[in-house]
């Protein structure tokens, strides 16, 4: 396909026009009085949202240079969302301000590479200042405040704080659609996986159709069990101990299954067989997780262990196991704490190294099962459009709350960024590097200005007022009052604010150092087919 090329100022201005169109659509959502944006969908009802990354993803521009500019800013929003789960609108506003100020200096003759170095040094100094300002999250109320701001709903914030309190910071909080109106929280203690009993005859409570085993032995096998002769030596040892048995295997079938069922029905021996969760390598990993959590060993011929030779020392233990037809929950596994912590560290390292969103999600589920627990927030709404929007807000708020626990909290509402500009007094830069740092200092005002504008106030006046207030004091845009932001619960996770600034600066540096843009040449629309002859579709 033929290409078109733009150079110098023409190239940079083309990129800037695209960035401005995207940023102007996104920034109207910033702050407590930010508006919503309606997104048309090819199928189904339109989506109404105030989430920056969702809006950015929908924008496709016609002009090839503008399209590239918009795509670069989409990357800012996406990267911030991936890392911190929130702050996408702030990142977009910062990027727009940095690029605008930087391009003005480039047009005036500043060296783009020196500007880039100045921007990078300034951003590093501000990021360090933000982390120094950050206060550790100490109370459930602080988590609730942070999540409430992200979701623009105090009920959602309180529910997320409740969920995090129950499952811990490593636990998984998932959001599901509910058929009922309102919000519900469902908690699962211990490890849960989505495989239930192989036969309904294993149920111990026929009314609820679930099997409950107290203080059972747990046999973990990475293969099918069909021959009862392989299982008998171990069954006899477990029966002598007087404890029930949970068997987790690829499958239990044939005479092995019928022997277990018959003994359960007669009351001779209490046991339950369930299929192993997952497939392939993921199944091996999950069986390993169960073994470490329960203090058992995976019996697999790959490591030279055979079922017929297995003793009680290879079995895991737990305080309680509850099995339904769809899922199994293991409570208080008897695994060694050091081994469990080692497994947690290993899974966390795999998450950091994974490039696939799907793999990362599955690894997060494994991490939650090993380290914490699982909480499910069920969200309902009057219409499908509202339900989608609400679910998305809750997912963002969950990630926001986790970011707050990770790196602490700073004053929200754009105040932390503005007041971090005090670090510029200590920066000793000269020439165009100093000009680059000055562009960052000016850009730090942009989020607060935009929040004020969206609240119907004069941005410049608000910035000057907040600049002269004590550290941590700023504008509560919801009421128009100047308050102590942290005392009022107007908080942002330090990780969100820091990521927004770093990602915005990264893209701004690319804009400023661009000297040429190469894009696909737009194809001319094909000429329409000529119309038929008069009466050409009539029968004679």
Curated annotation (Swiss-Prot):
Job of this protein: Together with its co-chaperonin GroES, plays an essential role in assisting protein folding. The GroEL-GroES system forms a nano-cage that allows encapsulation of the non-native substrate proteins and provides a physical environment optimized to promote and accelerate protein folding.
Localization annotation: Cytoplasm
List of residues binding ATP: 29-32, 86-90, 413, 476-478, 492
MF (Gene Ontology): ATP binding; ATP-dependent protein folding chaperone; isomerase activity; unfolded protein binding
Catalyses which reaction(s): ATP + H2O + a folded polypeptide = ADP + phosphate + an unfolded polypeptide
Protein species of origin: Streptomyces albus G
SUPFAM superfamilies linked: GroEL apical domain-like, GroEL equatorial domain-like, GroEL-intermediate domain like
Protein name per its UniProtKB record: Chaperonin GroEL 2
Subunit structure: Forms a cylinder of 14 subunits composed of two heptameric rings stacked back-to-back. Interacts with the co-chaperonin GroES.
InterPro entries, sorted: Chaperonin_Cpn60_CS, Cpn60/GroEL, Cpn60/GroEL/TCP-1, GroEL-like_apical_dom_sf, GROEL-like_equatorial_sf, TCP-1-like_intermed_sf
Disulfide bonds: none
EC code: 5.6.1.7
GO biological process terms, semicolon-separated: protein refolding
PANTHER family linked: 60 KDA HEAT SHOCK PROTEIN, MITOCHONDRIAL (PTHR45633)
Family annotation (Pfam families): Cpn60_TCP1
Superkingdom, natural source: Bacteria
Family: Belongs to the chaperonin (HSP60) family.
Keywords: ATP-binding, Chaperone, Cytoplasm, Isomerase, Nucleotide-binding
Residue ranges that the Swiss-Prot or TrEMBL entry lists as coiled coil: none
PROSITE patterns: CHAPERONINS_CPN60 (PS00296)
Entry keyword annotation includes Nucleotide-binding: yes
């Amino acid at each position: 396909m033929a290409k078109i090329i733009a150079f110098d100022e023409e190239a940079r201005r083309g990129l800037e026009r695209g960035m401005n169109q995207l940023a102007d659509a996104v920034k109207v959502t910033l702050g407590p009085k930010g508006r919503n944006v309606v997104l048309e969908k090819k199928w189904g009802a339109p989506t109404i949202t105030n989430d920056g990354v969702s809006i950015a993803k929908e924008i496709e521009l016609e002009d090839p240079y503008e399209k590239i500019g918009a795509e670069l800013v989409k990357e800012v929003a996406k990267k911030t969302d991936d890392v911190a789960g929130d702050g996408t609108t702030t990142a977009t506003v910062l990027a727009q301000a940095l690029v605008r100020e930087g391009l003005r200096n480039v047009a005036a003759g500043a060296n783009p590479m020196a500007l880039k170095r100045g921007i990078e040094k300034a951003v590093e100094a501000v990021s360090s200042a933000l982390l120094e300002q950050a206060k550790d999250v100490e109370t459930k109320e602080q988590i609730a405040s942070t999540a409430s701001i992200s979701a623009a709903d105090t009920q959602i914030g309180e529910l997320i704080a409740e969920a995090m309190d129950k499952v811990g910071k490593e636990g998984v909080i998932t959001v599901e659609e509910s058929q009922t109106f309102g919000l519900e929280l469902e908690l699962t203690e211990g490890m849960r996986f989505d495989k239930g009993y192989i036969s309904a005859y294993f149920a111990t409570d026929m009314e609820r159709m679930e099997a409950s085993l107290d203080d059972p032995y747990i046999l973990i096998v990475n293969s099918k069990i069909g021959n009862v002769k392989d299982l008998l030596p171990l069954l006899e040892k477990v029966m002598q101990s007087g404890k029930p048995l949970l068997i987790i295997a690829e499958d239990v079938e044939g005479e092995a299954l019928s022997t277990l069922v018959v003994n359960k029905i007669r009351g001779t021996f209490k046991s339950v067989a369930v299929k192993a969760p997952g497939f392939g390598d993921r199944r091996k990993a999950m069986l390993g997780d169960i073994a470490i959590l329960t203090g058992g060993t995976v019996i697999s011929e790959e490591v030279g262990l055979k079922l017929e030779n297995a003793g009680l020392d290879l079995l895991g233990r737990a305080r309680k196991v509850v099995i339904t037809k769809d899922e199994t929950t293991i409570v208080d596994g008897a695994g060694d704490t050091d081994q469990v912590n080692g497994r947690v560290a290993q899974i966390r390292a795999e998450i950091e190294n994974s490039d696939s969103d799907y793999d990362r999600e599955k690894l997060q589920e494994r991490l939650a099962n090993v380290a914490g627990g699982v909480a499910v927030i069920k969200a309902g709404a009057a219409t499908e459009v509202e339900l989608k929007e609400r679910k998305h807000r809750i997912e963002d708020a969950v990630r926001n709350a986790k970011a707050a626990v990770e790196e602490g909290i700073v004053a929200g509402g754009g105040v932390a960024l503005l007041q971090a500009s005090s670090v510029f007094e200590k920066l000793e830069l000269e020439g165009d590097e100093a000009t680059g740092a000055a562009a960052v200092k000016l850009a730090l005002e942009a989020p607060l200005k935009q929040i004020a504008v969206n609240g119907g106030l004069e941005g410049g006046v608000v910035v000057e007022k907040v600049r002269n207030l004590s550290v941590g004091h700023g504008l509560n845009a919801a009421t128009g009052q100047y308050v102590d932001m942290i005392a009022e619960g107007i908080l942002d996770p330090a990780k969100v604010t820091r990521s927004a600034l770093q990602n915005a600066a990264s893209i701004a540096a690319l804009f400023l150092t661009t000297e040429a843009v190469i894009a696909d040449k737009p194809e001319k629309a094909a000429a329409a087919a000529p119309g038929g002859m008069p009466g050409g579709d009539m029968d004679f």
